[in-house]
């Protein structure tokens, strides 16, 4: 039986569920039994390295063990739903169906779909690329429901809300969670609209996780987002922690804040607040009014790269670095390879940062959008660089995106101020040239370390 058939096999899903029951009874004692069940049920070679790393981390009772105990302290029903939806449905069953669909249809099929429920926001943050879309666009409840229904048929069970501020649509977000209890939903949010009532709704539906945006400490955060926002975020985190609900932090690193958000003090603050993960994003000069000077220089990006990796081996929090972690997933993940983005107007973009498209979800099916010219160009071009520290066709390889956009006839999907693709990528050229030397050095060191 091949990997796809094994993962789709009901016995494999049953083995995972049995493992979770063991953990519920006595997590510390039964972890070895759980690993044994997974080993016996898994296809040969399936995530072998990761399974060994988990085993080692648990045996040493270090930061990964501490993180595991925090996960097991979550509300039991929320935890059970997360493991079922995220591990069994999205990462096992879903991945197998994605692979099958990809081979059959000759197109990328995403592990996750990013959606903008609305372009509206209750804040007016300085330099926000999402603000380029204005505040009047919305995907209807039925459109979101239909996208997810289509996505599940392709094998996609993970959905991530961006914006705008998704929590402006709190009621509809909960309705979607109810309609699709087999999916896991994550939302990037400024956190100011999370209250006691919404926490109770999260406990009820069980399949929603917020990723709260923080730009650093109070001065930096409120300087960009407005006075009092930091305190509102702290209150939201206190509520989530009190209800044993999972949440994480999202942060954009720039030349101005990179030291603060990779400091031990910042890490310790969010860990104490109850965050289970932190997702780092590199500042992208998207939009006609972007500020290229906020892009970190090579030394600053390297500092971020090194600090995140250091804390991965010492802090009980899962750290993701969107730009510097490409080696773990083979380069650029956009264009439907692992994810795509649908904005509040329905335009299907290859990336949340790259707003050029041939398709609108109101006019074509999700599958047809994945077969559209710009998505096929991504499929053909990936990876855009053999150096996994230079994954993006815009930021690190600015010669690639204009070529794809022009050859496919894709148009700008920014309704407020459409940006010419050459204008966008010209802003990235000095950065790419400066980063290449450092990236090559770091990548060579990384390859040598693996030998």
Label for each model-derived stretch:
Residues 141-161, 167-281:
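Radical SAM/AdoMet-radical enzyme domain recognition
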Residues 121, 125-128, 332, 346, ...:
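Short cysteine clusters
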Residues 131-135, 217-219, 285-288:
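A short, flexible beta-alpha/helix-coil linker loop
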Residues 1-52, 56, 222-335, 343-345, ...:
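Radical SAM enzyme [4Fe-4S]-AdoMet core and its adjacent flexible, acidic
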Residues 32-197, 205:
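Conserved alpha-helical substructure of the radical SAM core
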Residues 2-7, 11, 15, 22, ...:
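Flexible mid-to-C-terminal extensions adjoining Fe-S/redox cofactors in radical SAM and related proteins
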Residues 89-110, 320, 326, 360-377:
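Short, charged low-complexity linear segments at domain edges
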């Amino acid at each position: 039986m091949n990997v796809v058939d094994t993962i789709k096999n009901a016995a494999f899903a049953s083995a995972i569920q049995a493992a979770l029951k063991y953990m519920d009874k006595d997590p510390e004692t039964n972890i070895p039994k759980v690993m044994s069940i997974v080993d016996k049920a898994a296809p040969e070679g399936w995530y072998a390295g990761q399974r060994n790393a988990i085993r080692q981390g648990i045996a040493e009772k270090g930061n990964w063990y501490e993180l595991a105990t925090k996960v097991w302290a979550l509300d039991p029903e929320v935890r059970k739903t997360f493991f079922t939806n995220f591990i069994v449905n999205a990462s096992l069953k879903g991945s197998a169906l994605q692979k099958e669909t990809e081979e059959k249809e000759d197109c990328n099929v995403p592990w996750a779909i990013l959606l903008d429920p609305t372009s509206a926001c209750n804040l007016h943050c300085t330099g926000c690329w999402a603000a380029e879309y204005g505040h009047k666009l919305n995907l209807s409840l039925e459109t979101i429901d239909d996208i997810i229904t289509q996505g599940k048929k392709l094998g996609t069970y993970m959905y991530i809300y961006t914006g705008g501020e998704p929590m402006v649509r709190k009621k509809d977000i909960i309705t979607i969670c109810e309609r699709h209890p087999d999916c896991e939903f994550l939302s990037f949010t400024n956190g100011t609209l999370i209250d006691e009532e919404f926490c109770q709704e999260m406990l009820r539906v069980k399949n929603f996780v917020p990723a709260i945006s923080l730009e650093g400490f109070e001065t930096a955060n409120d300087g960009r987002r407005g006075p009092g926002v930091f305190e509102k975020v702290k209150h939201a985190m206190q509520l989530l922690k009190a209800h044993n609900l999972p949440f994480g932090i999202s942060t954009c690193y720039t030349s101005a804040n990179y030291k603060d958000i990779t400091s031990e003090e910042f890490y310790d603050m969010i860990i104490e607040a109850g965050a289970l993960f932190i997702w780092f994003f590199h500042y992208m000069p998207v939009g006609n009014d972007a500020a290229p000077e906020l892009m970190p220089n090579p030394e600053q990006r390297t500092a971020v790269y090194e600090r995140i990796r250091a804390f991965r081996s010492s802090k009980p929090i899962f750290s993701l670095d969107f730009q510097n972690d490409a080696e773990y997933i083979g380069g650029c993940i956009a264009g439907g390879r692992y994810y795509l983005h649908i904005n509040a107007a329905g335009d299907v973009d290859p990336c949340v940062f790259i707003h050029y498209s041939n398709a609108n979800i109101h006019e074509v099916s999700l599958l047809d959008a994945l077969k559209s010219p710009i998505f096929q160009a991504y499929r053909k071009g990936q990876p855009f660089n053999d150096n996994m520290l230079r994954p993006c066709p815009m930021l690190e390889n600015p010669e690639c995106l204009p070529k794809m956009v022009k050859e496919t006839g894709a148009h700008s999907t920014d309704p407020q101020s459409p940006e010419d693709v050459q204008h966008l990528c010209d802003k990235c050229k000095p950065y790419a040239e400066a980063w290449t030397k450092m990236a090559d050095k770091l990548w060579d060191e990384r390859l040598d370390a693996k030998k």
